[in-house]
């Protein structure tokens, strides 16, 4: 049997490959063992979850077995969004992984890794060392298991995650809003009823119209990548048909959120960045922070730094890349960061990105005033976007 070449699936910030071709259970078991050995996690808790892709559950089990064999205490979190992993790593101060290929097609799966406190594992912080050690284990066999490996346990963090998000943005007193949510058959189909609905907590003044909430890693309706305009069409149509105030679209692992206004038009992520930045600056100033820092990446609209400065904050421009941005968030003590790709980072969320918390800020801003979203969004994006051109070199 040919040994998999892990260089095909290990990227700069995560692991992604085609199931059965560049990633399989044997490889995942070796990666689990290497994760513990490289990061020095013997005797420590390791949190393990995954999305709705068919391979995520067996991959999580295989990773747990590999981690346990090297002395870690694996805890299976079950089906989770990626930001649930970051929450759990922050809350329990433990390292963890989640199996997801985010918005990639159904044939793919992958791994996003974090250290204790939700600090990302990337090529700069051990990811390639994990790859190399795991490659050795695949070629030569796993080391002998530790004596008395820990029992693999289970934990559901959805209720704690939902309660924590609600503690950061109070939606209980906003005006009633009609909200269409397109989960794209991804993990937002699990998290939305818990956070915004009344599945686990008290009801909010939100009338939610669900679109593709059934968890299905084959993505039968459309790819779970709202960055592509074609994948927003169903949501845009539904918002108009329902006469909704707002539409929300999440990607497959629900760490990114895109917004549609009442007319069915997509709202620029730069406008969302500016809107949330204003709210976070005001909150930080109310808590006594003199000049709150806001992170924005290279391709956000210039409206973002202009608004931040006008509101008494300090904008810091960074290059693209979630691991890099999280590091800058921590270094600068930034209260919030936004990317034009609709990744939104919060100091109060362990410097990690969470689409759901960003969505809650938008709902709060909309529901705390009487105007429509299209007019509100125009305040935050006064410039015409030029779009992006991606070139391979």
Task: Indicate residue ranges for each PLM-predicted region.
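Gly/Ser/Thr-enriched, mixed-charge loops and adjacent short helices
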Residues: 109-242
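Phosphate-binding and adjacent anionic-ligand microenvironments
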Residues: 246, 286-393
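Glycine-rich phosphate-binding loop
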Residues: 94-108, 113, 239-261, 265-266, ...
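An N-terminal, well-structured beta->alpha segment
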Residues: 1-63, 69-70, 151-176
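Gly/Ser/Thr-rich active-site loops/lids in small-molecule metabolic enzymes
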Residues: 200-205, 210-212, 265-284, 322, ...
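N-terminal small/polar loop signature for handling phosphorylated ligands or for N-terminal nucleophile
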Residues: 45-109, 195-260
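Short glycine-rich phosphate-binding loop at a beta-alpha junction
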Residues: 43-51, 178-180, 292-298, 335
């Amino acid at each position: 049997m040919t040994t998999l070449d892990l260089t095909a699936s290990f990227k700069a910030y995560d692991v992604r490959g085609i199931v059965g071709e560049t990633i399989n259970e044997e490889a995942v078991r070796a990666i689990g063992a290497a994760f513990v050995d490289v990061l020095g996690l013997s005797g420590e808790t390791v949190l393990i979850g995954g999305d709705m892709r068919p391979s995520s559950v067996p991959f999580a089990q295989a990773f747990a077995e590999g981690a346990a064999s090297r002395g870690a205490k694996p805890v299976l979190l079950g089906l989770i969004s990626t930001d649930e992993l970051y929450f759990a790593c922050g809350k329990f101060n433990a390292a963890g992984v989640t199996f997801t290929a985010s918005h990639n097609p159904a044939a793919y799966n992958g791994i996003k890794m974090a250290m204790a406190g939700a600090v990302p594992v990337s090529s700069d912080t051990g990811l390639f060392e994990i790859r190399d050690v795991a490659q050795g284990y695949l070629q030569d066999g796993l080391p002998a298991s530790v004596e008395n490996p820990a029992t693999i346990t289970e934990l559901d963090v959805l209720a704690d995650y939902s309660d924590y998000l609600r503690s950061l943005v109070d939606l209980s007193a906003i005006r009633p809003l009609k909200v269409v949510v397109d989960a794209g058959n991804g993990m937002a189909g699990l998290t939305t009823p818990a956070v915004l609905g009344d599945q686990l907590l008290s009801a909010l003044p939100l009338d939610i119209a669900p679109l593709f909430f059934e968890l299905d890693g084959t993505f039968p309706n459309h790819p779970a990548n709202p960055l592509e305009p074609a994948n927003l069409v169903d949501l845009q149509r539904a918002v108009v048909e329902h006469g909704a105030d707002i539409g929300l679209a999440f990607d497959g692992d629900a760490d990114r959120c895109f917004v549609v206004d009442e007319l069915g038009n997509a709202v620029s992520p730069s406008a969302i960045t500016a809107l949330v930045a204003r709210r976070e600056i005001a909150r930080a100033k109310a808590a006594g922070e003199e000049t709150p820092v806001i992170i924005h990446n290279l391709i956000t609209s210039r409206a973002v730094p202009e608004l931040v400065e006008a509101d008494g904050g300090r904008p810091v421009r960074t290059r693209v890349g979630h691991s890099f941005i999280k590091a800058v968030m921590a270094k600068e003590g930034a209260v919030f960061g936004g990317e034009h790709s609709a990744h939104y980072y919060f100091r109060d969320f362990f410097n990690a990105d969470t689409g759901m918390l960003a969505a809650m800020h938008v709902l709060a801003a909309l529901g705390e005033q009487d105007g429509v979203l299209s007019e509100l969004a125009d305040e935050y994006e006064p410039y015409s976007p030029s779009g992006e051109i991606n070139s391979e070199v």
